[in-house]
Amino acid sequence: GAVFGYAASKVNKIQKIEVKKETLKESITEEVEHKSGYLNVAVFGLDSRDGSLDKGNRSDTIMIASLNKATGEVKLVSVYRDTLLKLDDGSYNKANAAYSYFGPDGGVALLNENMDMNIEKYVSVNFNALVDVIDAVGGMDLELTDAEVVHMNNYCVETSKVTGKDYEKIEPEVE
């Protein structure tokens, strides 16, 4: 209940980018346009350091959330960001380049064209949104090797500066 309420309050603060529906529909083939019963939403996790959600940011995370309208069941599929796929301009590049070069409409077009999807809606989040969600659920417990602890501490310094949030240095476990 409390996590849902917190998440709902954050949704109202989401930065929105207007994309013409016609632009998204251009990448939907006639065959998949007529499929119904599901709502497919593209989810992009961006490497944005300045809070922007438009082109120029690579999508480190690319997922498709598919909602079965009859049952309410949601399935998530991740698309590996380094997968070589056809971009909106006909060239081939890593999947995460589509958002950077063409913005969210290019990211959605990439999924529609290469995955035979009918996606018309998308959600883009940056580091701040990820930190807020982790805080809302009370943090995360991870098992890390000593080498991973070193990398996480380095990463946390940058993330802390970007998000304006404090963090506690991770100490290796002593056995």
Name what the model sees in each region.
Residues 3-175:
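Non-catalytic, solvent-exposed segments at the cell envelope interface
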